[in-house]
Amino acid sequence: MEEYAREPCPWRIVDDCGGAFTMGTIGGGIFQAIKGFRNSPVGVNHRLRGSLTAIKTRAPQLGGSFAVWGGLFSMIDCSMVQVRGKEDPWNSITSGALTGAILAARNGPVAMVGSAAMGGILLALIEGAGILLTRFASAQFPNGPQFAEDPSQLPSTQLPSSPFGDYRQYQ
C-alpha cells in the first residue's frame, strides 16, 4: 500500500510529530474536560472551572507525549525505509514495536517486551485495516475495457464516404 500524499522522509518526521501533538492535545483536551467536569464539586460554575483547569493542566502534557511517540515512530520508520530500500507495512510494524520498546526502556526489560508487542500488534492491525480498506475500495471501481495504444491494431471499419472527398476528419 503506497501513500502518495506523504512528505519525503526528513520532513515526514516533523509532519508526524506535529500531527501527533495536535491529536494528543485535542483528544486529551476533550478527555480532560469530561474528567474535570465529573470530578469537580457540585455546581455549574465549579464544574466548568474544574473542567477548564484540567484542560489547561493535562492537555499540553498529553500532546507532548503524543508528539514524542510520533516523532520517534517517524524517525525509526524513515530509518527502516533507508536501510531496507522499500516502503511497505513491515516498516510501520517494526517501527511501532521499536517505538514501544524504546519508550518503555526506563521500566525494565519486561515492560519493553510488553510495549514492543503492543506497539507491533497495534500497528499490524492498523496496516491490515488499511490494506483491507484499499482492497475493498478498489473493488468498487472495476477497470474498464483496455484500449489499444497503437491504432494499427484496431479492426478496420469502412467509414461512409465523405462529401468533402476522402478526408476522414473524425477517424
Curated annotation (Swiss-Prot):
Subcellular location: Mitochondrion inner membrane
Keywords associated with the record: Disulfide bond, Membrane, Mitochondrion, Mitochondrion inner membrane, Protein transport, Translocation, Transmembrane, Transmembrane helix, Transport
Pfam families reported for this sequence: Tim17
Major site of localization recorded for this protein: mitochondrion
Post-translational events: Degraded by YMEL1 downstream of the integrated stress response (ISR).
Task performed by this protein: Essential component of the TIM23 complex, a complex that mediates the translocation of transit peptide-containing proteins across the mitochondrial inner membrane.
Subunit structure: Component of the TIM23 complex at least composed of TIMM23, TIMM17 (TIMM17A or TIMM17B) and TIMM50. The complex interacts with the TIMM44 component of the PAM complex and with DNAJC15.
Designated name of the protein: Mitochondrial import inner membrane translocase subunit Tim17-A
Species assigned in the record: Homo sapiens (Human)
